[in-house]
């Protein structure tokens, strides 16, 4: 519901605490939790590049994160009727490597630098308050942060109690 309102522009950066190095014309990534994490980051980078709207990519990311593996990525794509071949081509080719490098540059350019993941930035800022609020109730955080006319979906977040008549 929130994505269709236009009050949120969400970006996911599946890079985490990885480190990159260059070997020839290729980038090599070492992920904090090993090769499987790097594999899933690469799959997610390709999916995010190919599916531009959160209503398209969020169901895939959610599905993949339930069981992060290449075989589950293919299953998720099938379940969600997403063509696997372009993702596979990206994943296995130079495009995926380039996308991961771009994610590294964006992650490393964060100010302040990220200290953990997930690292939440709202309106170009990161604070502990933003982090805590967004992680505990993203809908409420977005609705409270948005300065324009609040959409209907935000009205339900303002009521914490419902008293008897």
Placement of each model-derived feature along the sequence:
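Structural alpha/beta surface segment adjacent to cysteine/selenocysteine redox centers
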Residues: 1-88, 156-165
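C-terminal cap of thioredoxin/glutaredoxin-like
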Residues: 63, 67-165
């Amino acid at each position: 519901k929130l994505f269709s309102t236009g009050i949120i522009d969400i970006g996911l950066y599946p890079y985490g605490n990885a480190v990159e190095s260059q070997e020839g014309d290729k980038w090599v990534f070492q992920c904090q939790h090993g090769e499987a994490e790097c594999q899933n980051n690469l799959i997610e980078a390709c999916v995010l590049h190919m599916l531009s709207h959160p209503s398209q990519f969020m169901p895939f990311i959610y599905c993949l994160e339930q069981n992060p593996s290449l075989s589950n990525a293919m299953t998720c794509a099938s379940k969600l009727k997403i063509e696997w071949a372009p993702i596979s081509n990206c994943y296995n080719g130079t495009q995926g490597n380039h996308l991961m490098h771009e994610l590294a540059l964006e992650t490393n350019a964060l100010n302040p630098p990220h200290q953990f993941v997930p690292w939440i930035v709202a309106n170009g800022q990161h604070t502990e308050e933003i982090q805590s609020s967004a992680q505990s109730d993203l809908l409420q955080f977005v609705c409270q942060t948005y300065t324009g006319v609040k959409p209907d979906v935000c009205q339900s977040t303002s009521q914490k109690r419902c008293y008897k008549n």
